Amino acid sequence: MQTKLFYFFVLLSFIPGFFLVQQEQFVALSIWIILITLFSLWYDWKFCLLNLTIVGFFIAFCYFVPAVKINQIVKNNFIRTPFINWIDQTTKGELNQYLKLFLINETTKNNLYQNALKLNIVHLFVISGFHLSFLFNLMERFLWKRWYLNKLSGFAVLLIYLFLVGFAFSALRVFISTLLKQVFKKQLPEDNLSLTALLIILISNHALNNFGFNFSFLACFVLLFVNKLKLLKALKPLVSSSLILIVISPLSLYLNSRLNAFSVLFNLLFSPIALFYFCVSWIILPFIGVFGQASFGIYLPLKMLSEWSLKVTVFLQIPKPNLIFFFVYYGLLGLLYTIFTVAYYDNNLWSRYWANSPKIKSNQKQFSI
């Protein structure tokens, strides 16, 4: 049994069940359980039994256990709160907004964040897994490797950052995923995204109701998918941006009720810019007391670019999607991903469970006769 596919299928089976239980659609839930049972049995009875057991546990856990929202419980902690107070005392106005956005994921009353939301590129301007992975990889590569000091330092920085951003799900994803990779290097596949999602749901059982959680994991699924495709290196950013737009557009529509026709181009344009300002914000932080509000000058090009982008873009007004649309849309995407994964990434699995199945072999013999 392929663990990567198994965790993905468990997650794919659980998510509709979670929302059906929330809506108290128990008849639809029963039909869904029958469907995933039949599909699992077609694959393997052990797979079916294990999948149903885990999915049933997660649905019961989310239904009976009171809602735990870890990102709200620990948002004001002993690291984040003093840091915010220091920024508020040292800066004001737009400089205060921009520093909070790039350093600690604070989006309240932030003009740049609102512009990014309208442009459908909001995932680039919050502290994402990409930023933290970049930070950990930087420390792992360049710090002293003896006694695993580089990895220990990397985890220490990730943990501090986790408190700084108030346990945002995108940061929690990187921390758990990186920890799993380092501790269970041989036992788990390298991209343990589905397992990480299930563990976060165990920590915060209503994580699926959080848009940050959904944006982070959906975008990451797309990036992992594209990285394994045999494409020209120059084409990968374009393909990634296009697929991310396709995958997260229902969430963007739900928040904004319109789509940016130039989203793909703006994703390509703003991706390196967002990473640049993430790094620059930390570099200028020690000098804020010296230069004061003049430090905002470094953010002026970004502000002007975001405002210009709003003026030149074309918006498509589309009705806000409902729950049924989400089920159908992401159900089809999940099914296509599963089929493509089996057929493209693992030919042995495809051959073992389909091409070499008794039914197919018997049809081949009849055809040859």
Swiss-Prot record:
Parts of the chain that traverse the membrane: 25-45, 47-67, 119-139, 152-172, 206-226, 235-255, 272-292, 296-316, 323-343
Compartments in which it is found: Cell membrane
Keyword NADP: no
InterPro entries (alphabetical): ComEC_N, Competence_DNA_uptake
Topology term for the membrane: Multi-pass membrane protein
Any Pfam family matching the protein: Competence
GO cellular component, one term: plasma membrane
Record has Translocase as a keyword: no
Keywords: Cell membrane, Membrane, Transmembrane, Transmembrane helix
Source superkingdom: Bacteria
Family to which this protein belongs: To B.subtilis ComEC.
Protein name: Uncharacterized protein MG316
Organism field: Mycoplasma genitalium (strain ATCC 33530 / DSM 19775 / NCTC 10195 / G37) (Mycoplasmoides genitalium)
Classification lineage: Bacteria, Bacillati, Mycoplasmatota, Mycoplasmoidales, Mycoplasmoidaceae
